[in-house]
Amino acid sequence: MLLAIDNGNTNVKFALVNQAGAIVQRWRLATDIKRTADEYAVWLNQLLEMEGYTRADVDAVVIASVVPRAVHNLQELAAKYF
């Protein structure tokens, strides 16, 4: 599955997209440029597990952002945990 991350000024939105292109799960978190990759990972891992998924189910990550200062931590999240 694809993990799509949309980083906006107010919220960071996460969606799991299956092979058919359908969104099977979505979550939202308040944007905070101080939030670390590790913090994102703990939060996201818990939500994945609550819905019956694991990080191993994610084959790829795509990030869209209008908050340049927050991109680095999201890129680190993708590289380190997926």
Model-based region annotation:
Residues 51-82:
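Short beta-strand-loop/turn "lid" adjacent to the catalytic site in phosphate-handling enzymes
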